[in-house]
Amino acid sequence: MGSSFKSPADTAKACSAIAELKEKAPLGKVIVLSFLAGAYIAFGGLLAEVVTGGMAKAGYPAGLVKLVFGAVFPVGLMLVVIAGSELFTGNCMYMPLGILDKRASIMGLIRNWVTSWVFNLVGAVFVAYFLAVATGILTADPWQAGALTVAKTKALGGASFIAAGKVTKSLTWAQAFWRAVGCNWLVCLAVYLAIASDDIIGKIWGIWFPIFAFVAIGFEHSVANMFFIPVGIFLGGVTWSQFFMNNLIPVTLGNIVGGAIFVACLYWYTYLKE
């Protein structure tokens, strides 16, 4: 009986080969798959907000709320990896690894990153408006209050606000950046573990643990925030400029560092550098 998983070196080679395929993918397919990835991550975010919406107000410990939020969110990345789609944060690992292994180009990276980022945003905002707000799922309490707290914590740039009767501090630019570094380090490891596994159950567990960890810790994922913060915008608690300037820019940059440096570069150096 053969092994059901790849060695770390073979996994690095497989990721490099995937980068080559992404380099050659037709633009139209990348656009569709990027829209789907944004929607899939948004589904995970919507599920997490629904199941935890009233927990803080009901007096549950903050750690338990984070645990439940993190436990259900990984369904989004499971859909991305197993059903197939183009997720910007995963591409922050794939494309640099392919470039270092001479199987992808800088121009291919730029095309892939820009396309996946833009259409991840389109897919996530689509779910935020049409499936979370227009449906009424997140417009009634306690879910509206919970969704607004999540969005404000991420997007108010260090300002304080009242949530569940308590003063809550939002993230500063630097905090958002470093939380994003940690986030995509773990997200890309989740993708790496999924590629390492040759069966679907192994892929599911390989994804679940690192994604659960990043969410429960409180790290920042750019594509997830393309859902969480627009929900807050549609509910009237945050502005588009606050979204981009205070969160999406630093979190995107931090996600690039986390995936490209701490996963792609280090595993290329360890397993692929000749």
Curated annotation (Swiss-Prot):
Membrane topology type: Multi-pass membrane protein
Subcellular location field: Cell membrane
Family: Belongs to the FNT transporter (TC 1.A.16) family.
One biological process term in Gene Ontology: nitrite transport
Known role: May act as a formate transporter.
Biological source species: Methanothermobacter thermautotrophicus (Methanobacterium thermoformicicum)
Cross-referenced InterPro entries: Aquaporin-like, For/NO2_transpt, For/NO2_transpt_CS
Stored NCBIfam families: fnt
Keyword entries, A-Z: Cell membrane, Membrane, Transmembrane, Transmembrane helix, Transport
Domain of life: Archaea
One Gene Ontology MF term: high-affinity secondary active nitrite transmembrane transporter activity
A Gene Ontology cellular-component term: plasma membrane
Transmembrane segments: 31-51, 62-82, 118-138, 176-196, 200-220, 226-246, 248-268
Name of the protein described by the UniProt record: Probable formate transporter
